[in-house]
């Protein structure tokens, strides 16, 4: 069994562990560093599933904006919701707390449109809730794309290729 995880065995069979791979020629490197002295732009690119934990970030923005003003944090969600569950976890929060200005739903984007969104971004949002699916160790493609674009990023799972690197932040693998 070949896996992107660190599991030695799966279903009783020994594994061959590899890292997920990307084609660097297909991924555009971010060209400049944005001025973050007045605002911060986060980007999450995915077919949005519950394990991405984007609802955790939106709840964090609710708490942030209830306690702070003056420094704006924007969350650009790029991709479609996989199911109603994900929509129902995120969209009502945005509406209830008037976050439409700060949580921007772009839908699916590719090519130059996606590259332009990455140019605006200051940090990538990886999976923030892999614990919901029982996965603790995984080497996701999205983390590799953020790194290839030269974008710092945050995630909650264990990814042995990136642990301890200066350009990543780790979120707790829980519901905080």
Predicted features and spans:
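Short hydrophobic "strand-cap" motifs at the C-terminus of beta-strands
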Residues: 4, 18, 42-46, 78, ...
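Nucleotide-activated donor-binding/catalytic signature segment of Leloir-type glycosyltransferases, i.e.
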Residues: 78-79, 87-116, 120-123
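Conserved donor-binding/catalytic core segment of Leloir-type glycosyltransferases
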Residues: 34-61, 75-76
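Short donor-sugar binding/catalytic loops of nucleotide-sugar-dependent glycosyltransferases
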Residues: 45-50, 81-82, 109
């Amino acid at each position: 069994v070949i896996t992107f995880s660190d599991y030695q065995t799966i279903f009783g069979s020994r594994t061959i562990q590899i890292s997920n791979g990307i084609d660097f020629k297909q991924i555009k490197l971010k060209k400049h560093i944005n001025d973050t002295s007045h605002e911060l732009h986060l980007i999450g690119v995915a077919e949005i599933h519950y394990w991405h934990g984007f609802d955790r970030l939106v709840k964090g923005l609710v708490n942030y904006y209830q306690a702070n003003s003056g420094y704006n944090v924007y969350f650009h969600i790029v991709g479609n919701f996989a199911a109603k569950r994900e929509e129902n976890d995120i969209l009502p929060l945005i509406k209830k707390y008037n976050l439409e200005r700060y949580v921007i739903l772009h839908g699916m984007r590719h090519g130059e449109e996606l590259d332009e969104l990455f140019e605006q971004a200051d940090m990538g949002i990886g999976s923030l809730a892999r614990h919901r699916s029982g996965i603790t160790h995984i080497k996701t493609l999205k983390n590799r794309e953020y790194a290839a674009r030269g974008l710092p990023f945050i995630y909650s799972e264990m990814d042995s290729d990136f642990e301890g690197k200066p350009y990543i932040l780790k979120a707790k693998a829980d519901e905080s």
